[in-house]
Design a protein with these regions (language model features):
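A charged, aromatic-enriched C-terminal amphipathic alpha-helix characteristic of glycosyltransferases
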Residues: 15, 327-358
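Short hydrophobic beta-strand element within catalytic cores of glycosyltransferases
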Residues: 285-288
């Protein structure tokens, strides 16, 4: 049996955590003894409890300082790896990658690259700091056995910089809401065409511009639901009109997707958005900025139309196009389950793990 440990900053229910959880839930337990190592505080206690009840060993390092970890003070993590005697370490994120690259271990070291660091780090940290973080991260990645990008579009960037890189697209389980929301509860008419955005309200997500353009181009029967919080929340509220519902952070976004028609994102950079996959799983059309990862998922819908792309110059015309698409919710759901499922993602990762095991 292969002993595998997934390593992440902390485990929650969204973002890179959802990729880790989907892998854990879909690997063959007769072949893998699975552990999870979390580095910092911030774990969702419900998720940790469910994992342990499902036979996963969870190590919570609860280290306090991310910067100290990057500077080499990571003894708790090193001790866990030494005692665990793992065959495979699979890290997620810059700090886990850096720590893994410094280990003296016989374990084969995987990582999943969840973003385009050249865009994401620049937007998050500014030019000077982003150069430092990119150099640090690349140096770590080159020491690992395999770097798996979360999309082909991220792979197209990283293949220029890494010799040990491949890609496996993110996939998700079929999503289910934990509650029922009605359109009346959010003051939306039953016959309205409902657009929805779910995510952080920050500059990288370009949400202020999106609201401005929606206000400019929406028709009388169209509404936009905005789920999320963040640094741009006050500015978003100032730009909204009476067709925009600012609903704040919601723990059950799928319930709101179930009363929507179109998922919209004007993000400037994405790895392979889990929210987009969740929207497809709910049968929503996609109305997305024309960044590479968005182009990738829309272009996959060769036999059925799954959405429309826009840029800052043509969004008015793109609104006309999305209105004209004759979509079929059931076919969109089927498209997601056939092409972007957690089961398919896990099968592909299993193949990569097995290759490494055969080499040993």
């Amino acid at each position: 049996m292969v002993r595998i440990a997934y390593v992440i900053n902390y485990i929650v229910k969204n973002g890179p955590s959802s990729v880790v959880l989907n892998l854990i839930n879909n690997l063959d337990r007769s072949k893998y003894d699975i552990s999870l190592i979390t580095l910092f505080e911030g774990n969702n206690a419900e998720v940790v409890s469910a994992l342990r009840n499902n036979g996963v060993t969870v190590y919570e390092c609860n280290m306090l300082s991310r910067m100290k970890c990057l500077l080499g003070q990571s003894r708790k993590f090193s001790d866990v790896v030494e005692k665990g005697r793992f065959d495979i370490l699979h890290t997620h994120g810059i700090i886990p990658d850096v720590l893994s690259s410094r280990l003296h271990t016989t374990a084969k070291r995987f990582t999943t690259i969840h973003n385009n660091m050249y865009e994401d780090y620049l937007d998050s940290y500014g030019y000077a700091k982003s150069r430092i973080f990119i150099a640090l991260h690349l140096a770590a990645l080159k020491k690992l056995d395999e770097c798996v990008c979360c999309s082909e579009s991220v792979y197209d960037v990283m293949i220029r910089h890494l010799p040990n890189v491949s890609f496996i697209r993110n996939g998700i389980e079929p999503v289910q809401a934990h509650s029922v929301i009605t359109r009346a509860e959010v003051d939306v008419p039953e016959d309205a065409q409902v657009f929805l955005y779910a995510g952080v309200l920050n500059s990288r997500k370009n949400i202020v511009w999106l609201i401005e353009e929606f206000v400019r181009y929406h028709e009388s029967d169209e509404c936009l639901l905005v789920l999320g919080s963040g640094e741009k929340e006050a500015e978003c509220k100032a730009k909204a009109d009476d067709h925009v519902r600012m609903l704040g952070f919601q723990t059950d976004p799928i319930a709101y997707m179930n009363i929507s028609d179109v998922y919209v994102s004007a993000s400037k950079s994405e790895g392979f958005s889990i929210s987009v996959l969740e929207a497809l799983s709910c049968g929503l059309e996609l109305f997305l900025s024309n960044i590479p990862s968005h182009e990738e998922v829309v272009s996959m819908g060769r036999t059925i139309p799954v959405g429309e792309l826009f840029d800052e110059k043509n969004i008015g015309g793109a609104f006309d196009n999305i209105r004209s698409i004759q979509s079929n919710k059931d076919k969109i759901i089927e498209f997601q389950r056939e092409n972007l499922s957690a089961c398919k993602m896990a099968e592909l990762y299993n193949s990569e793990y097995q290759k490494i095991e055969r080499i040993q």
